[in-house]
C-alpha cells in the first residue's frame, strides 16, 4: 500500500478520490487553502489535512496527486520533484482503475452527478455492490465515493474538463447531452464535440453506449456507432447526421406529477424481436423532466449490466437528491430555500422548470452567481431564456475560479443584458451582500433559489440565518 498526498483535497473530485484510496487500504494526507465538510469527513477517517501549502507536507509520501490546474511552481510540487516523489493526476488514477476493473462512465454537459448517483443506486438496489465516484455527497449512497466490490463495476462521473474523461476505457457509458461548455478548455463548440466523439469511441463495446436521443449533440454521436438510445415520449429518433430513423431502446412515457415527485412508464424496445414492452413503472421523489431522462439512463445502464429492474426501480424511489442538486436548505418565514449547482444557462432553465413543477403557484426568486468570465461571456445570448420562470433575478459578482477579470463590471453588464430582454434583474453585489439583497425582495410564499458552482450555497445558508434572526426579533 502507498501513501498518497493530495494537493487540493477539499475539492469535490479530489476528496472523493481520497475516499476510494482509503477504501483500498492506502494512506492519505492532503492540503488545501480551505476546510469544509469534505475535509472534515476525511479527517474523521484519520486523514491528515493541512490548511495552506508547505513543502514539508509531502514528506513521507510515495505519490503526490494534483489536478492539472496546479502548476509546477507550487511549493509542494517543487518539494516532491526535488525528493523524486512521482506526481499523478486524476486522469492517471482513472486510467489505472479502468484497467483494474470494469468502469461505467457517465458523461455529458449536464446531469452527470444525478445520473451517476442513480446508476449506482440502481445497481446496488439490485444487489450489485458497485463502486462509485461522484462529484457530490449522496446521502442515499452514504457519501460521494466507495470502492465497493472490486469485481463489480466502478461507476464514475466522467468529467470532460481538461479532457480527463478520455483517460477512461469504459465497459459501459452514458452520454446525457453535449452542449458547449468550458470555453477556457474548449475555445470552440467543435472542439468540445470532438472530445465527446473521442470519448464515445473509447467505450469497449459500442452497443454498451447509451445516448440521449432528446439531445441533438448527443444524438449526433449515436450516428457514428451502434449506441443504444433513450429519451422521453418519442419512440423514434431522427439521426441529425444520417437523417435515418432509429428506434429508441428505452423510452419514458406518461410522465405525471405526484404530491412528492413524479411517475412514468419505462418502455424497452427489443431489437431482435422488434417488439416493445413495458419494463417498469418508475416513481421519483425528485422533480424535473431532466431527472426523468437521468433516471431512464440509469435504469437502462443497470439493465444492460444484468440488474433486476424491479429492485433497481424500488431503489430509485428512495433517492432524495445529492448535495447542491435541487437541495432543500430550509423554510423560514414562509420562504422555501433551494440551492443548486446550476451554472450553465441550460442547467439554470432546467432547475427553474423543476421548481415550477414542484411549486406551481409560488414566485421564484433567483440568485445567480455566474461562474467564470469565459463561460459568462461565451454563453451570453443564452442567459435571458434561462430565467423566463423567475419573478426576480439577482446577479452576484462573477465567481472567477481560475480566471482573471473584473467580477463587478461583467455582472452588471449581465444584469443590463437580462433587463434588455424583459427579465426583471438587479445587481446583488458580492456574495457577502447577497443575503441582504434577497431579503429586500423575498416575501412569505416565495421560493428562493441560489444557483452557481462557486460558493452560492453559503449565500443560501446566510440568507436562512438572517431570515431566522428577523423572525425571532418579531
Swiss-Prot record:
Binding sites annotated in the UniProt record for ATP: 108-114
Major localization class: cytoplasm
Keyword vocabulary terms for this entry: ATP-binding, Cell cycle, Cell division, Cell shape, Cell wall biogenesis/degradation, Cytoplasm, Ligase, Nucleotide-binding, Peptidoglycan synthesis
The protein's annotated pathway: Cell wall biogenesis; peptidoglycan biosynthesis
Uppermost EC category: ligase
Catalytic reaction annotation: UDP-N-acetyl-alpha-D-muramate + L-alanine + ATP = UDP-N-acetyl-alpha-D-muramoyl-L-alanine + ADP + phosphate + H(+)
Record-linked InterPro entries: Mur-like_cat_sf, Mur_ligase_C, Mur_ligase_C_dom_sf, Mur_ligase_cen, Mur_ligase_N, MurCDEF_pg_biosynth, UDP-N-AcMur_Ala_ligase_MurC
Gene3D superfamilies: Mur ligase, C-terminal domain, Mur-like, catalytic domain, NAD(P)-binding Rossmann-like Domain
NCBIfam families: murC
Source organism (scientific name): Chloroflexus aurantiacus (strain ATCC 29366 / DSM 635 / J-10-fl)
Gene Ontology CC: cytoplasm
Keyword Ribosomal protein appears in the UniProt entry: no
Biological role: Cell wall formation.
A GO term for molecular function: ATP binding
EC number of the protein: 6.3.2.8
Protein's GO biological process: cell division; cell wall organization; peptidoglycan biosynthetic process; regulation of cell shape
Residue ranges of coiled coil: none
Compartments (UniProt record): Cytoplasm
Protein name per the record: UDP-N-acetylmuramate--L-alanine ligase
Membrane spanning residue stretches: none
Family: Belongs to the MurCDEF family.
Source organism phylogeny: Bacteria, Bacillati, Chloroflexota, Chloroflexia, Chloroflexales
